[in-house]
Amino acid sequence: MTALLTETQRENQDTRLIPLSALQHYAFCPRQCALIHNEQAWAENYLTAQGKALHERVDSDEPETHKGVRFERTVHVSVEKPGISGILDLVEADTKTGRLKPVEYKRGKPKPDPGDEIQLCAQGLCLEEMTGQTVSEGALWYMQTRHRVPVVFSDGLRAQTLATLAAVRELLNSGQTPPPDYGKRCKACSLAEI
């Protein structure tokens, strides 16, 4: 199939904006990423329904300033470099320094895989590209534990994020869906039966 693509089609594949959520999906399971983003498959379960309800509450609040921090919700980002688009749950802006910090809301609790951190770091990369300023950290807020976890965007995490982005781009451009690789994580996946 690749041999039949025109030069313009190849360029379009390389410049396709990858959804921020695809990075987290890929880190969790490449098959899940392909099912959602290539095949447009989706199935609700109680976990996805809880996550949707959480984001509806977060997204419904208006911007506000409190104790020197401006809280902007539902921030749309789209950057050609590194080629990502999506919606940030919350961006905190220090009113004195202008420093930005993305905050991602998650339904559950901290996970052993780095998917949440990779998705958050990608948000920081988007803000950097859009504003020209360094975004050195963000935070993950977990509903289940009601705990906020700071995340430093180290050189290692940035490299891991860019490597994941490249892998997602390759997967989505291939149009292929990997076979199932069953494990403990499949119990929580709404797409496990697909």
Give, region by region, the residue ranges found by the protein language model.
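Metal-dependent nuclease catalytic cores that hydrolyze phosphodiester bonds in DNA/RNA
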Residues: 1-102
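Non-catalytic, well-ordered alpha-helical scaffold segments
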Residues: 17-21, 85, 117-121, 184-187
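Immediate flanking context of iron-sulfur cluster ligation sites
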Residues: 20, 167-188
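Extracellular/secretory pathway and lumenal proteins
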Residues: 33, 190-193
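Iron-sulfur (Fe-S) cluster-binding segments and ferredoxin-like electron-carrier domains
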Residues: 38-39, 192-194
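A general structural signal for short secondary-structure boundary/capping elements
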Residues: 70, 148-150, 183-188
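Nucleic-acid nuclease catalytic cores
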Residues: 80-86, 93-172, 193
